[in-house]
């Protein structure tokens, strides 16, 4: 605990540990680590929780409402009769943190930067798929369209056409009017524009510090680039109510932007600190050194948090998470000298890369996960059951799909069938990973290990906690054989779960090398159903996909606990919006 208190002092928020944080300061201790502060690159809750406070989009959520949007950097918009053009009228008098005025050119630059770079491990696909029709970066799409043996001339021609689509996707009608031109109608486009990737960046500031020039001249140099190496990774170019002071990789310090168009917020300083150990976070909460902390489960809330004085547990039966948690299987593990698959062979000391391509193994592991224990013991009955990777309250969810619960006899039956009996005969060794500090995922990993190893002494599972950034990196590199992970919605439409989890080009499915033409065909077709009278058909397709997923089992959905927020009891203005990465905007809170 001492090292964290010393860090608070070193960051200049106060000179010593006190009974309460200053009245104008908000201190939040989270379990995860920020990956990137670039709106195009950031694609995890810890990163987006910062981005959504230092940057802004054209519209934003109206506090705790998922269906009501309020004008932010735009004041109004219209949609063409054919649903292909969205025109926004921008707010005048908005200044970036640099002092530069915001105009249409900044909005255009920000969206086109998404379309130009399209990092493979980012959310840029959210916009590319509807504005240009492409869900991957230009070179990836060129190889997909032309094949690996395409000539340079063929690739250049494809890239020229791709650039023309980027140019046509966003246009400035005048200094304060911007239009987005869709490749095809999409009912979720407005919802997509609320995602942090659509945040408006100070184009002059960005270009001056070495980012993409905003022109055709250097766009090819930026295709698919990892933006963690660029200036905006650690520097702020936003309009938000807070501006970045410092990010050292583990701690974010921000301060109120006095030139904010919406008026300076009450809270003047913010510290978001990544603290892996839950016990350390809880002690900081108890002492008053933190205003909010991450707590992993309802079991901890009931056993420890509710015993603390001066602490408030915010919860409401109406709160429903916009997320899903599953155990992923990798159908073809990647990476040389991969430490998670042992020998790389089915010899008792490892697993082959395509180990989980056998449905019998996936079923066996599913029957080794004690979902009742997760729901009843870890969540103490505060949660929701999941039959598929879609929130139960969202359209297209099928509550009638069966749930595989703990059944070691069935697990043994499927283990004996796996790989023609060789798995049972030879045994295996693999490693399950989770992000360090996340006791829920640790519990899931330990359950699977204990139950699998109890079936056959030749079955061996190691468990390896990884730092959050390393965990994400390993998952994106497709090097993990099996791992538990959650997904929070980017935009409020069921497509944002169905496509990532079940489509071969989905941001999650491609990490596990899951490819099934029948899934792809249905999901692609569902995306063409954009008219109001077609929505019932679209949601029936999603239910069918859920039933197919039960049979194919690309992942194991498991219960998700009911949301709660833990703060000191003097924090006011707290609310829960499941579409925000950290539940509420900093500008809305204060202290009594």
PLM region descriptions:
Residues 8-15:
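Bacterial N-terminal signal peptides
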Residues 29-81, 237-238:
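N-terminal lobe/hinge region of extracytoplasmic solute-binding protein
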